[in-house]
């Protein structure tokens, strides 16, 4: 019970509206893809995905390679731009009239080889996926 009250308070302070307020607004208006705010959020989302890909600890340029002498594994993380889905919704809030939702898939790619060089050269195959959803609010003419 204390965790749910804390979560409600935290989200109310951070986003300017409570999750209960969002749930009450099931009739939130989904903006069309040709709306200028939607295209603005789409650019923001792609920039965010580029930042996420750049900030992974293990990237295609800096992959993790481990081995036990006979088999080596090269591994890195990446968000595929084709997995990105964005939505912009108009809500009834004075502080944040719009929210943007980004959904994407983080994938872990691995390659096996007989030495660290062959493991680093690939071919790489996706071995794990994680679906991520991020919610942003539009305040003072920018996405936060």
Language model features with spans:
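Small/flexible residues
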Residues: 4-5, 77-80, 132
């Amino acid at each position: 019970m204390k965790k749910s009250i804390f979560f409600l308070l935290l989200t109310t302070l951070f986003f300017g509206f409570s999750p209960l307020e969002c749930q009450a607004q099931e009739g939130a208006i989904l903006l069309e893809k040709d709306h200028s705010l939607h295209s603005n959020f789409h650019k923001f989302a792609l920039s965010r995905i580029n930042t996420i890909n750049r900030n992974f600890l293990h990237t295609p340029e800096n992959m993790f390679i481990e081995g036990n002498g006979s088999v080596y594994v090269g591994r890195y993380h990446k968000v595929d731009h084709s997995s990105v889905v964005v939505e912009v919704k108009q809500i009834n809030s004075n502080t944040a009239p719009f929210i943007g939702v980004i959904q994407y898939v983080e994938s872990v790619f691995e390659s096996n080889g007989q030495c660290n060089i062959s493991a680093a050269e690939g071919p790489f195959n996706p071995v794990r996926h994680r679906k991520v959803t991020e919610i942003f609010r539009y305040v003072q003419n920018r996405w936060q």
